[in-house]
């Protein structure tokens, strides 16, 4: 039994999807709240958090019960275990950070997809199949179809080699990390600099040329709208930290103004 990834279906239909990044709140209930709020998916960040895989496992189970896909950003791209283990516990996909070379991309496909596309290790009767493997070949094919594999484009080498990177079969999305990209271009903190925006526009064009979904992380509605108008379709919107902090600040200010 394989979870049907409604986020991936929406993207195939040409829709825009939105989802926040979680890196602080360790609660399965967060998945239900995001589903109730209407988000299409959410990220769990292992690159910049202290989450254990056991913590992530509980959050993923809750997300599947609430029918909201989870995309895990692993802590590293450098070995199979960083990619395959989040998928084995039921993540609907991966956002693989710090991609720079074609070899990086080929490794991602090998470690995240089953044969014949990749060479992911076989352990089908796990959380990702609700502990029932079914027919082996059918299950492998279904998992390959439902998993979304996104490359995080956040280094100048990735920008320069992007057409080669996206030509590797098995990649669904090219997702820009604006902060790291700006730093890689020598202008840290200046995500609105023309050089950064030119690089991001390049990602959109090359992704579309290769039938790959372009995506980006944004911190505001205005910024999200700006990039949607330019062609972005997979939108990462804020973080759990920023969403909570914003509503708390707004509430406190409103309460104080009532005094």
Regions found by a protein language model. Give the residues of each.
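Alpha-helix-loop-beta-strand connector modules within alpha/beta enzyme cores
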Residues: 53-84, 88, 110-117, 141-145, ...
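Glycine-rich phosphate-binding active-site loops on the catalytic face of alpha/beta enzymes
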Residues: 93-104, 120, 174-183, 232-251
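Glycine-rich, proline-tolerant flexible connector loops at the mouths of alpha/beta enzymes
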Residues: 30-31, 35-58, 176-194
């Amino acid at each position: 039994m394989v979870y049907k990834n409604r986020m991936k279906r929406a993207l195939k239909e040409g829709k825009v999807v939105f989802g926040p990044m979680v890196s602080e709140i360790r609660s399965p209930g967060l998945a239900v709240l995001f589903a109730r709020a209407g988000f299409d998916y959410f990220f769990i960040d292992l690159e910049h958090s202290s989450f254990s895989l056991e913590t992530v496992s509980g959050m993923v189970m809750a997300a599947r019960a609430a029918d909201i896909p989870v995309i895990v950003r692993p802590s590293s791209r450098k070995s199979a275990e960083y990619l395959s283990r989040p998928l084995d516990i039921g993540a609907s996909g991966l956002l693989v950070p710090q991609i720079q070379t074609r070899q990086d991309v080929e490794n991602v496909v090998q470690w995240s997809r089953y044969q014949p596309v990749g060479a992911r290790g076989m352990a089908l009767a796990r959380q990702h199949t609700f502990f029932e493997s079914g027919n082996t070949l059918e299950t492998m094919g279904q998992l390959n179809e439902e998993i979304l594999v996104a490359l995080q484009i956040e280094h100048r080498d990735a920008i320069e080699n992007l057409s080669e990177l996206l030509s590797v079969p098995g990649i669904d999305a090219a997702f820009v990390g604006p902060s790291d990209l700006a730093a890689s271009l020598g202008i840290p903190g200046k995500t609105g600099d023309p050089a950064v925006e030119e690089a991001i526009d390049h990602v959109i064009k090359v992704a579309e040329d290769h039938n790959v979904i372009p995506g980006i992380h944004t911190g505001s509605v205005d910024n999200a709208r700006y990039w949607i108008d330019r062609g972005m379709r997979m939108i990462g919107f804020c973080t759990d930290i920023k969403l909570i902090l914003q509503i708390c600040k707004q509430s406190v200010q409103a309460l104080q103004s009532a005094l």
